[in-house]
């Protein structure tokens, strides 16, 4: 990751992608594009993420732009696309996407890959796809603050998390992808080859969200408010 390319200050914990989860019994053909979320035949069956960067990523990728765009004209265009989509969206959600998709309350939802993997355990009719227009790839990491009072204990905790057996237990509990290669080799072959849990990133057009500065944060937030209040 750009913030710590040599991993001198942080320890990778989990990672994943953002994509589309869909119920194969509720859609008439496979979903593989963000544009499918603008299809009126899925009115009131679509769940969008209630998150400014995730929502704008979807619209920006739909339009062929970077998810880290700082071009105001592109962002205005993305805002208009989200407003155009809004009448066919069932809800803007975060954690609720998981339960709604499992129960069949919605047919299509924008979701994080770790959540998607969990839903597939609960409902085998659910499929996850990273849209062909591109998406987001992310990584969560641990850091020890420079003013930490118990550095030794923090290091022991991180060493514990890095144990392959613990990493496997953690993965099986939270269902988010792990970067521990030794632990991955301890998983069954089907999971090791899962394109949901451990995709070959070279097969996808993916970007990491960048911090765009306070001015851009304000612009994104204001545009998102316009979408939500429309």
Where are the language model's segments positioned?
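Ligand-binding "clamshell"
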Residues: 4-7, 118-130, 192-194
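A bilobed periplasmic-binding-protein/Venus flytrap-type ligand-binding module shared by bacterial periplasmic
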Residues: 17-26, 61-62, 138-150, 169
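Short, hydrophobic alpha-helical packing/hinge segments within bilobed ligand-binding/sensory domains
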Residues: 34, 97-100, 116, 154, ...
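Periplasmic-binding protein-like
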Residues: 75-84, 122-146
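A ligand-binding cleft/hinge motif common to bilobed small-molecule-binding domains
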Residues: 102-103, 108-125
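Mature extracytoplasmic/periplasmic domains
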Residues: 145-204
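Conserved C-terminal helix/tail region of periplasmic/extracytoplasmic solute-binding proteins
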Residues: 202-230
């Amino acid at each position: 990751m750009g913030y710590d390319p040599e991993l001198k200050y942080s320890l990778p914990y989990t990672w994943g992608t953002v994509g589309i989860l869909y119920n194969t019994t509720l859609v008439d053909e496979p979903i593989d594009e963000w544009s499918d979320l603008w299809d009126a035949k899925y009115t009131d069956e679509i769940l969008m993420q209630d998150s400014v960067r995730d929502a704008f990523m979807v619209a920006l990728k739909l339009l062929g732009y970077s998810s880290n765009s700082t071009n105001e004209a592109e962002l205005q265009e993305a805002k208009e696309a989200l407003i155009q989509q809004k009448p066919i969206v069932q809800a803007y959600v975060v954690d609720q996407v998981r339960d709604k998709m499992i129960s069949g309350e919605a047919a299509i939802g924008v979701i994080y890959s770790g959540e998607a993997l969990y839903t597939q355990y609960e409902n085998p009719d659910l499929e996850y796809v990273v849209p062909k227009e591109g998406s987001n790839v992310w990584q969560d990491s641990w850091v020890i603050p420079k003013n930490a009072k118990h550095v030794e204990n923090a290091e022991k905790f991180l060493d514990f998390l890095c144990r392959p057996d613990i990493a496997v237990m953690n993965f099986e509990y939270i269902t988010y992808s792990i970067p521990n290669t030794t632990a991955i080799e301890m998983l069954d072959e089907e999971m090791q080859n899962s394109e949901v849990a451990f995709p070959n990133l070279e097969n996808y057009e993916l970007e990491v969200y960048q911090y765009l500065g306070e001015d851009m944060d304000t612009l994104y937030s204001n545009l998102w408010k316009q979408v939500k209040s429309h």
